[in-house]
Amino acid sequence: MLENLKKEFLQPSEEFTPIPFWFWNDYLTEEELDRQMLAFKEKGVDGFVIHPRLGLPEEIGYLTDTYFQYVRYAVKRASQLHMKVVLYDEAMYPSGSCHGQVVRENPAFASRGLRMSDRESAEEGELLIAAVKREGKTWYFWEGPSGGTIRGVHYGEDDGEAGAPASADLMNPEAVALFLQLTHERYYQELKEYFGNTIIGIFTDEPNILGRCSKEGMIAWSGNFLEDFYRQGGNEQDLYLLFADTDSSEGRRAGERYKRAVYERMSRAYYRQIADWCAAHGVAMTGHPEKSTDIGYLQHFTIPCQDIVWRYVAPEEEKAITGEHSTMGKCSSDSARHRGKRRNGNECFGCCGAPEDPYRFTMEDMKWYLDWLFVRGVNMIFPHAFYYSLRDRRKEERPPEVGMHSSFWEDYHIASDYIKRMCGLLTDSVNQAKVAVLCRDVYKRQVEKMLQDGRMPTVFQSVNQPNGWDRYYEMTERYDKLGF
């Protein structure tokens, strides 16, 4: 056994390769795709994520025949080179709109939100769902389009720009079904012979219910969502608390009911549909939810992931061990271990350059981040990113570049071998931890269920007494401040 372990460590398997986000961000040619893929392979990079990215010319429109000419070439060549491919489900992010096509086909599928107003006057497309008397006034609750967008792949489609594609209503199962039809089914029709062999997964990226750049003062909502909220114990008075009184114990309880309703609806409408589609087509559902602490949604992923971005985790200012983002490594690895899933990953290094110079990122920096992930049990690495092109403005889009244009590319095989060795070692080893610190949302639901079943340990019985949940919230808030 030890000899096999030693052999696997010294000669790590290609299975554990880094799988970089490959930014397709310029005019593409088959010759250049081939050149870069051969360069990846030479440095021990045996897979990649095809990631259409800002800078892709309009002549190569997303999911057009021209676009698929290059996708087919890259996937076929990957098969010949014994490389693996992960498809990316959007252009560019967050996921769920098919570059705005979902909303173009049905405007009713645009992202929606809820706002509170003291005026009985609707904005365009809004529906009045409740009127609540509180604090001597009548408050009106309007459901309507959030105005949210995604970052697109062509210039003029970034945040705040006129061409930014509309985001879709991810809590509407019909909108998500259309997203799957437009995106996943199209990829399958074009590449079905590679599904389950060369193509190992599809990456969904931080789905955002409201979309980016949405109207201020809104919370996530969708059609018939009020019924979901009521099923979780919410009521019309709670609507006021969601906007105006979030800090009191009453407001916190309303917030918990709302979060549970969002979680159940989003799980059913978005994550479960995608997971079922991927399972039926022989590929892994991978990627990550919007927040670093969204451990519940990870149950739907074949390969649950999180992402290190913007130096939210970093060596300085105790960012490695404090705050919500410091939980992400254990969030993905413990989710996988708890549910018997062999791999879990991280999309890492995005916008993690030096604070004084976002382009500066050394191999030492890379190793710090890798070790931070490995010690927490992460065993699949998605480097962000290998840029197809750095021409003109492209080098300014979410640096640093950590691939063949980087200063350390000559020695990248060292990083590849290190990643393979550590990911291989972590994948089939057994975690010996005997104590779990449960996240706030999951813990609360488990406590409630144990109370209902009469199985609550004596030490926690106080939460069932008067003001018990207030003490529970005080306890979990202390955990929050510690980064658990």
Language-model segment annotations:
Residues 51-177, 181, 192-193:
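Acidic/aromatic-lined carbohydrate-recognition and catalytic surfaces
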Residues 8, 12-19, 29-35, 47-48, ...:
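Carbohydrate-binding surfaces of carbohydrate-active enzymes
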Residues 1-7:
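Basic/polar N-terminal segments that are highly enriched at the extreme N-terminus
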Residues 34-42:
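Extended, non-globular alpha-helical segments
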Residues 182-186:
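A Trp-anchored, charged/polar loop motif used as the substrate-binding/catalytic surface
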Residues 24-25:
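Alpha-helical support elements that line or immediately flank enzyme active sites
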